Amino acid sequence: MANATQADLTGGGGLSGLVHWANGMLACVPRSLSLLLLRIALAVPFLKSGWLKWDGFLTLSAGAKYVFQEEFKLHILGAEYSYPFPLTMAFLAGLGEIILPILLILGLGTRFAAFGLLGMTVVIQLTVPEGWANFHLPWAAMAIALIVFGGGRLSADQVIGLNRMD
């Protein structure tokens, strides 16, 4: 009986053996690959949104102008407020949603880019409060992980020596 218990505890058989094997396989995934995938996963929704805000080089789309002027409201303490300077906010959001994700994918200034996208996520949360569980919470978690861990070895930060904490 002692041998069967010992085999289960060391991953020798059954479900615990399968779990032990799976853990070993997952441990082979390099941290740098995980951080690269995390950077891409956070960048994609912002980049897609940013592309929709432009009609040409530094020319906001009619849709972006409309939603920032007419539809988007900040929900703060139970009240709704119009965006201050809506066209400026649309322009800055559009720039941020293009520049920051590109930096993130390249791994250039990863912590800065992730912090910027975290700030944008907070503003988006105030604008679309019902999106917190499906979108904003995962975005915030990914951004915080990248702020803490940086871009990893597969990043421009690593090449130029900005990954001091890695």
Residue ranges and their predicted role:
Residues 1-63, 76-99, 103-166:
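Extended, low-polarity transmembrane helix blocks
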Residues 69-74:
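Transmembrane alpha-helices and adjacent helix-loop boundaries
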